[in-house]
């Protein structure tokens, strides 16, 4: 989907200079900090109201940790998370509780994210009970039936336990639970990666239908680039805790500029054998460096085919090389 088709509203979410560092300790009795995992190390991006923003990268790049910081499941080490004018990194107590009604999550694993001891109806109704938005039990149940129907299941599933359902059905329950509080913004943390391929398209189409129906805004975290291209208006690419490229979906997939983005897209198989044989595939050399001791300068330089001496010393700052196309690489002009 092109930038021209994307919503033009002001940003609903703005992430500025986000850092999330975890201490590494050793010892049992007298444990001491011996290092720091820089899971997120200076991330900036915006999400406009009504759009789906993709956040992609290899496993361990920090995309899920970024999502957890936005949800305030983790307290950021530094930076700002401006949601509708309020810095979520700083709020506490009732203010944070109120914001969490507006910001919800769909978890990656539809098996471990549902309580096996609770019936589906109780799982979906629990957020309403906790936040006190629908104290009447009969109205809560009616809302549960409505959400189950909207998510393609139906009221009969309310009395089932999670183990009686398939993976796709469980993920629909997770989606219904995320909708229970009438949120504005949903973090979708790889919501289809644990599902069969035959079910993935159904869930992706459901998410798109719900976005249009309820005016939702998504941060869609994923590593399946074909799903991201189908669903997202804009995409940010992360590598080792940093965003290396941002652009609208069509531009990023058709004209990637950062060497890492180019390598990611080159690794996606093409179903046409003739096209697959004819393209220039250059796999990324080496291994992903440790986030405990990341490389100096550009974190991608040890694996980059375009790296020069400057890349080893100077961390590239994100800059707009074309309208709406931001790249963190000094060798891109």
Protein language model regions, located:
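ABC ATPase NBD coupling module
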Residues: 29-34, 88-104, 130, 137, ...
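Charged, flexible cofactor/metal-binding loops and thiol motifs
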Residues: 3-11, 25-31, 248-333
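Conserved ABC ATPase signature
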Residues: 161-165, 169
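Conserved ABC transporter NBD signature motif
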Residues: 79-87
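P-loop NTP-binding/switch modules centered on Walker-like glycine-rich loops
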Residues: 187, 191-195, 199-277
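Conserved ABC ATPase "signature" region
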Residues: 86-87, 138-156, 262-266
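A short, proline-enriched helix->beta-strand linker immediately N-terminal to the Walker B motif
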Residues: 180-184
